[in-house]
Amino acid sequence: MGQASKVFGKQITYSVSPFQQKLFVNYFKNAIPHLRRGVKDNFFCSVPYFAALYITVNWANETYHNEMKDHWY
C-alpha cells in the first residue's frame, strides 16, 4: 500500500498517502455489533444511574406541577 517506510531501532513505521486510504472502512458494518457488546458489557453499571435520574426527574416534575396547581389563580 505505502512505499515510504522508516526503521527506528526495532520499530517500523509506514506512511500511507491520504489518497490511498479509505475513509470509515467497515465502520457501519461493525457499528451494530460493537454497540450491542458495549451495552451488554456496561448494562449493570449504567442502569442504576439512569434509574436514579428517572426517579429524580419524575419527582421534580410532579412537585413542580403540584405547586403550580396550588398557585392557580
Curated annotation (Swiss-Prot):
Keyword Mitochondrion in annotation: yes
Localization annotation: Mitochondrion inner membrane
Q: Alphabetically list the UniProt keywords.
A: Electron transport, Membrane, Mitochondrion, Mitochondrion inner membrane, Respiratory chain, Transmembrane, Transmembrane helix, Transport
Mitochondrial matrix compartment segments = 1-42
Matches recorded under Pfam families: UcrQ
GO CC terms on record? mitochondrial inner membrane; respiratory chain complex III
Q: What spans does the record annotate as topological domain Mitochondrial intermembrane, numbered to this chain? A: 61-73
Any GO BP: mitochondrial electron transport, ubiquinol to cytochrome c
Family of this protein: Belongs to the UQCRQ/QCR8 family.
Subunit composition?
Component of the ubiquinol-cytochrome c oxidoreductase (cytochrome b-c1 complex, complex III, CIII), a multisubunit enzyme composed of 3 respiratory subunits cytochrome b, cytochrome c1 and Rieske protein, 2 core protein subunits, and additional low-molecular weight protein subunits. The complex exists as an obligatory dimer and forms supercomplexes (SCs) in the inner mitochondrial membrane with cytochrome c oxidase (complex IV, CIV).
Q: What does this protein do?
A: Component of the ubiquinol-cytochrome c oxidoreductase, a multisubunit transmembrane complex that is part of the mitochondrial electron transport chain which drives oxidative phosphorylation.
Question: What's the protein name?
Answer: Probable cytochrome b-c1 complex subunit 8
Q: Organism classification, top ranks?
A: Eukaryota, Amoebozoa, Evosea, Eumycetozoa, Dictyostelia
